[in-house]
Amino acid sequence: MIKRSAVVLMAVILTGCGNKTLEEVGNAPAMSPVGSGLRYNQAPQLASYPKQTKAVSNGYSLWNDSQAALFKDSRAINVGDLLTVNISIADKAKFKNDTSRSRKNSTSLTWSTVINLFGITPPDSSGDMSTDSNSSSDGKGSVDRSETLTLMVAAVVTSILENGNLLISGSQEVRVNHEVRILNVAGIVRPQDVDAKNTISYEKIAEARISYGGKGRLTEVQQPPVGQQVVDMFSPF
């Protein structure tokens, strides 16, 4: 009987949890796909990298056509081209809110009824009624945070939108001892915002998705155990 009750309880927990919630247990929150904030009927699809065309050799020339880019713009404009993303975030926010509300209400009612019917006067019927109500609330909240992140990462042009804007995506992993630091960047850029050094600053990236985290021994220790996360998910306190 106890075993059956435990099975039923576990089934109820799993049903109420849902597949999406279970996938998030033990993992960092997933970032939304690039382009999901745009008003498109469908999200922009990533295109496959184009094949590089064969260089045509000319027997009467000392130079190869593949290197004929003396006056060519070296900025990323095609699918598969690379560009450098400069990330320099120094955000600081400080908020302080105080709210106070007070309300007072008072109601008084007095009545007196005397009826003379066929010469008969009943006893006097009169009364008083009053109500008083008071309510008040006070609330305080404050936020004080600062974040600094300075990195550079190479990204690849993965797609070109209909209006000519570029969809880029880049990733970088660095392993130090048993900890892997992961940097991901993705977003939509305008070709004219890419400077002559083929570099673009992060604040010029629309729908920017910048993630800097890691995985390894230190990250595992900093996260609460999976069982505790499941319990916290259903705990009402």
Swiss-Prot record:
Keyword annotations of the record: Bacterial flagellum, Cell outer membrane, Lipoprotein, Membrane, Palmitate, Signal
Lipid-anchored residues (S-diacylglycerol cysteine): 17
Secretion signal span: 1-16
InterPro entries xref list: Flag_Lring (IPR000527)
Region of interest (Disordered), residue spans: 122-143
Membrane topology according to the record: Lipid-anchor
Low complexity bias: start-end ranges: 124-140
GO biological process terms on file: bacterial-type flagellum-dependent cell motility
PROSITE patterns (UniProt xref): PROKAR_LIPOPROTEIN (PS51257)
GO MF annotations, alphabetized: cytoskeletal motor activity
Domain of life assignment: Bacteria
Compartments (UniProt record): Cell outer membrane; Bacterial flagellum basal body
Assembly description: The basal body constitutes a major portion of the flagellar organelle and consists of four rings (L,P,S, and M) mounted on a central rod.
Reported function: Assembles around the rod to form the L-ring and probably protects the motor/basal body from shearing forces during rotation.
NCBIfam families: PRK00249.1-5 (NF001305)
Annotated protein name in UniProt: Flagellar L-ring protein
The species this protein was found in: Allorhizobium ampelinum (strain ATCC BAA-846 / DSM 112012 / S4)
Taxon lineage: Bacteria, Pseudomonadati, Pseudomonadota, Alphaproteobacteria, Hyphomicrobiales
